Design a protein with these regions (language model features):
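Short, Lys/Arg-enriched N-terminal segments with co-localized hydrophobic residues
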Residues: 8-22
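Active-site proximal loop and beta-alpha junction motif in alpha/beta enzyme cores
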Residues: 21-89, 94-223, 228-284
Length: 284
């Protein structure tokens, strides 16, 4: 399927039919308006991820915030998720899982392993193509600590490929301040992504942002799976048993489950609705 307005898109992104085409790129849109992801299904070299990501994000009609590449698995997964940034993303894992299920004609609830470049083992995704509900089991934090930020002593959770600072407050700082701070933290921790979440305990409401240094991108997702998982893990710390929690964010709610056994986090999952859009093909 081609873009509905190919001449407009080709003109603005310099992808013209008169130009000799070196490749055709197939992708599917996922996520809500304002936080759209492009799931690229064409096999491309990882060396091209950075350039293709920048070019696709520059197409204004797509209104995309992220680009992910769905590739053949390298291990025991059914599909592999890779990005130019290389950071852990619960949202992208859930979107990739549903896209895989739909592409295989799966019409019932099913669990399957999805690989990601930031973790050594596949992560279990539970998808229901009929309802669009998708849950992913994320890896537990590898380490935790504290940090003095924004005039408070904040907790820090280090996941594989991504770290989150957990603060209390009702609003995120201005973008320039966020970018500077998170860029410094990503460099200090030598990680693909550094994030911060602000939790308002009175309203039980959360906002988050993440900076990806490899693509120099600051994201403020309306409903972030990984941030919700970090919030749930922090709330359940040192409390034995099974903890279920609804995490409210500007873009909606996500359901989290944390299992603590013997003082260790044994399971961390986050789920909610995923929206898949049309599939497109672009030539350039």
């Amino acid at each position: 399927m081609f873009f509905r307005r190919p001449s407009c898109l080709e003109r603005r992104s310099h992808f013209t039919r008169k130009r000799a085409c070196s490749m055709k790129l197939s992708f599917q849109t996922a996520g809500p308006d304002g936080a759209r992801t492009l799931l690229v299904k064409t096999s491309v070299s990882p060396d091209a991820y950075q350039d293709l990501t920048q070019r696709l994000l520059s197409v204004q009609e797509l209104q995309a915030q992220q680009v992910a590449f769905l590739t053949p698995p390298q291990g025991d997964g059914v599909v592999r998720l890779e990005t130019a940034a290389g950071a852990l993303s619960g949202d992208l894992l859930r979107q990739a899982g549903l896209a895989f299920a739909v592409s295989r004609g799966i019409r019932r609830e099913k669990k399957f392993p999805v690989e990601a470049q930031s973790v050594p083992a596949p992560l279990l995704v539970h998808a229901n193509p009929l309802t669009g509900q998708v849950t992913v089991d994320l890896p537990p934090p590898q380490a935790q600590g504290t940090r003095s930020l924004f005039g408070q002593q904040a907790s820090v959770l280090h996941f594989p490929g991504l770290s989150y600072v957990i603060c209390q407050g009702s609003a995120l700082p201005p973008d320039p301040e966020l970018r500077t701070l998170l860029s410094q933290l990503a460099q200090e921790w030598e990680i693909p992504g550094a994030g911060v979440l602000f939790w308002n305990p009175q309203e039980d409401f959360m906002r988050s942002a993440v900076y990806l240094p490899k693509t120099d991108t600051l994201l403020q997702p309306p409903c972030c799976s990984t941030a919700a998982a970090a919030m749930a893990a922090w709330h359940a710390r040192r409390q034995e048993g099974l903890h279920k929690r609804t995490i409210r964010q500007p873009g909606g709610t996500l359901q989290t489950t944390v299992a603590i056994q013997g003082g260790s986090l044994r399971r961390l999952s986050v789920g909610g609705p995923v929206t898949l859009g049309p599939a497109y093909e672009i030539a350039f």
